[in-house]
């Protein structure tokens, strides 16, 4: 608001007004002297404030570069399983932010695992530090020492892509390896979403070899586990990769209580009461979706089941007695999934409405070539007594999983239509 002056006041107090005018004229010189004396300091403070702001701005950019470098290096470690070239990856990432190692005195340092912080014992954690000396301007009036700004970031690789995933979030022994079973996950990881202190349990002489083991809870029996990227407890739960997948609706019955002891080829459709293959059966499935409405897929010793581009759906039109699967000793299975369509990548598809813990068994001695995903999200799956999955691409996703026989998995899944379990992308943790 502007000041207001009143004419009456000027006439009433002329002496006072004249005195004030003379005082103002007398102070003009003093103001000039004070201003001259303080102006350098004021300008210095303004300049110093601007310089500190520039340091803060540079630190923010250094931090972005360090974050990117750590994520890039940790992701590379997750993919290749060793430390080769990690510093090169980190430096390439920081360079995209204008911080080129060796240029303008920029230094990029990498430690794997970190030398400080909460992840010094985490094998797949990578620490990146980016530093650069700053040129002093106004601050040189107060100090001549070198000022270096640094930014630090730590990223943890997620252990690579999974091929075995237990979805149960609370169970003890959501994944169990028992007996003398040897479970080999070639180039892929085991993931267990249970927060239980014994989420993954190895009993007896059972062994596990994997790219990594990622468990939300904890592990019982770590001495029998061999990994490339480490055992990660307290992990972030893995998402259900097929949560958005669905199978087409169905109705009626094309076959009732199908049973075979001979060589034959059958077509997609609804098989009410399931399928039973006995010794002497050599059944080939034409491509498509096979609905097992109640009953069981039973493949007994001496029987062979094969098919390319097939999905077997385990369901129930009544909401009761959901279909299951039982592959017994001496049976042979060779199945691969469709590569497109609503069930792409899925060779076994369990209805999400079936009771939790519905049993699916793959018994000892079975020669199994199961390509794609065994997606049984409510199932209690047992791989038992020497079951051997030799295909290059096998995923097992179930509520709980028990291995009591030798089992092999790999995820060379190009051309199978599968979806990845987990991600190779690392995440920032510090």
How should these model regions be labeled?
Residues 2-13, 19, 56-60, 64, ...:
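Short amphipathic secondary-structure patches
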Residues 15-39:
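Glycine-centered recognition micro-motifs in short, flexible terminal segments and loops
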Residues 36-50, 64:
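Alpha-helical hydrophobic helix detector
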Residues 122-126, 149-151, 186-188, 267, ...:
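Envelope-exposed proteins and targeting segments
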Residues 132-250, 258, 352-397, 401-406:
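Short, ordered "entry" segments at domain starts
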Residues 164, 170-178, 192, 198-202, ...:
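Beta-strand-rich extracellular passenger or scaffold domains
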Residues 247-259, 263-264, 415-430:
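Short, low-complexity, Pro/Ser/Thr/Gly-rich segments in the mature regions of secreted, periplasmic
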Residues 393-430:
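Short linear sequence signals and composition-biased patches located at protein termini or domain-edge surfaces
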